[in-house]
Amino acid sequence: MVPHSATPTPDPSPQGGGEKALPSLPCRRLAEPFEALRDASDHMLAKVGARPKVFLANLGKLSDFTARAMFAKNFYEAGGIEAPGNDGFKDQAVMIAAFKASGAKLACLCSSDVIYAEQALDAAKALTAAGAIVHLAGKPGELEAPLVEAGVKSFAYIGCDVVSTLQAAHDILGVK
């Protein structure tokens, strides 16, 4: 048996009268910003016959770039930006020729930290010289300042502001 308390339980209903009820927050789905980006991509497809595109500048062997290339593909495609795959580039001249042939304005470097340390600066400079707006998949770490100096404009990584990065990419690519 539960003992009876002599203290009355408080009434959960508001007392008094001078208190104002706050308006409720609007209902918003977390996917809405991504849906808006994909809708803008659909509009571009209907208008010009092609979606916005990013060139994946995959450096090194398949095992070097696969993780970040898949991350970058999913990252950009979540915002309606096509990210066609490729087998990677061991030669910078071949990468630049493939970038030019792709018709993309945006290029994203994809590889391992080891390959980034060896090749990312030169690749970023070459892509920038070829007319690319260069992004890099992954956190830049100690290479951030030299990468930015070499032409990298943005970094796509887990924990970054995905929506603002994709919106900036849409702006670069002329997606309205």
How should these model regions be labeled?
Residues M95-F99, A123, A169:
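Generic hydrophobic alpha-helical segments
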Residues P84, E118-Q119, L127-A132:
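Internal alpha/beta domain cores that form substrate/cofactor-binding pockets in large enzymes
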Residues K61, V114-I115, G141, V162:
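Residue-level marker for beta-strand->alpha-helix junctions and adjacent short loops that shape enzyme
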